């Protein structure tokens, strides 16, 4: 397999995110072949080296998990919440693997979310440098005027810059609501 940074080995095994894995290393919680590791960036071959976290051996042969979840309204797109509000973690209580949500939806939005322990996929799907388009079905109550549609297409100025859709298509709807396909 070759040499891999220790924090990536931990993240790939589903122990924690890379950042949290770095903190575990700095805290002295990680050993490789019986030697406590404190240095970030240390590389090992996970097929050969015995990696332990808090004295427990981790397996490098973790199978990848991909879950499709229909997030309901009223649920936060996070796996834990310090204020104990309803969140994705509540829906996954029986799952013990470390999962990442790929993207997020607002609390009052509903829709498909991908959850995985494949950190590389999650990174490629969400990091802006990969320019992966995101598609949304937007439902608004009432019939929307041409001015509102134009505002969506032209963008709006927010505190942190211009927010603009790449593509907006008005879809056939039902009386009393307007549907958009937004990219």
Report the location of each language-model feature.
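Basic, flexible Lys/Arg- and Gly-enriched helix-loop patches that mediate nucleic-acid binding at interfaces
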Residues: 1-183
């Amino acid at each position: 397999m070759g040499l891999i940074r220790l924090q990536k080995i931990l993240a790939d095994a589903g122990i924690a995110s890379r950042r949290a894995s770095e903190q575990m290393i700095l805290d002295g919680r990680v050993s490789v072949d019986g030697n406590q590791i404190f240095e970030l960036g240390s590389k090992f071959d996970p097929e050969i080296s015995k990696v332990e976290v808090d004295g427990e051996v981790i397996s490098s042969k973790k199978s990848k998990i991909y879950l499709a979840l229909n997030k309901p309204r009223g649920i936060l797109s996070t796996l834990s919440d310090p204020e104990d509000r309803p969140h994705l973690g509540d829906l996954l209580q029986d799952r013990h693997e470390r999962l990442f949500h790929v993207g997020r939806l607002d609390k009052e939005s509903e829709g498909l979310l991908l959850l995985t322990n494949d950190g590389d996929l999650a990174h490629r799907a969400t990091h802006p440098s990969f320019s992966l388009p995101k598609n949304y079905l937007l439902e608004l109550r009432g019939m929307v005027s041409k001015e509102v549609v134009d505002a969506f297409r032209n963008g709006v100025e927010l505190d942190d810059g211009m927010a603009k859709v790449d593509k907006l298509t008005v879809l056939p709807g039902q009386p009393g609501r307007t549907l958009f396909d937004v990219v």
